[in-house]
């Protein structure tokens, strides 16, 4: 007796979602809030970011990265853009543990919004660990809409095959596994396969629009992430005046340790394990990692979508580097490998701060920019975004998808 009404109710919900319109009304206030929410939902879900990035009256720019976006202070890019009413607003896309593979699949949800646009992309050398990042971290930021968006847009090329292979490695029980395996094996998808993908892609897109209208999680973050700092900054823009203000804030908030870290971070993340952390990173290397191949996925997408990115390479807090025993020569060799992969293919807009980790108040903690680091970031990024230019011609090299490159630790100029 109960089964019939439940079945009918389920069918009605399915039909409601399937025929729900995908376009959302633009609301600048809501879009500004979602842009700085820095929640898991704002990172991986489609509707809020697509709505903002397609707003004809405000230019939201994707800022891709990981957890650095959560380090807010008076010089944070979202704060400066709002305070000085710049021609753009950052849309912050990143979470702790996310790296290029998550970013690539997230991009599949918003390809029309990336076409011929500028973006900011932070590349942290810490991403390039021996085994890449944990499958659990990847899965946390992946969803069915990303999957069907990828399957719908894939072209059967080497990038698609590599992405499918990595997806199976990171998510062995992924939905539609048989289709992903076909791509990984370079098998052609059948007409029936493509029809199913299209049907599920439409459903996922409409489901995202339907539930996205109720998504307010993280909206309150706008006040504590942005509004609270606006009144601390001078009304007239001046780098020197802003530097004086954020430097005073940094001095006040790095007073309980000798490592130049924010007090709260030091108290909660470092202090209790300080002795154990001494020389704990002596054996770390970032030279051999699948992340180099994952990065190539992103570069391939940028080339296909004619995106003009600026890449940011952050430093490690120098005091922390020395204390933890992280080798400076290895770090710089990693940076050179990353830069070679970028520059040799035509991605030449790079702000390399990798040698600035010893500058006072440049870092918020061990590896994240803050205060004067954000100001240096702004001096590189704001002129780039305020004077938009088309993407240059890229010259992609598929060798960067190879295991040879992922594990190469020699002179980059000698790589064949």
Per-region residue spans from a language model:
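Extended hydrophobic/aromatic segments used for targeting, binding, or gating
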Residues: 82, 280, 287-293, 297-361
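Hydrophobic membrane-insertion alpha-helices, especially the h-region
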Residues: 1-21
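Catalytic nucleophile-elbow at a beta strand-turn-alpha helix junction centered on a G-D-S/GDSL motif
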Residues: 53-75
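Membrane-embedded segments
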Residues: 69-159
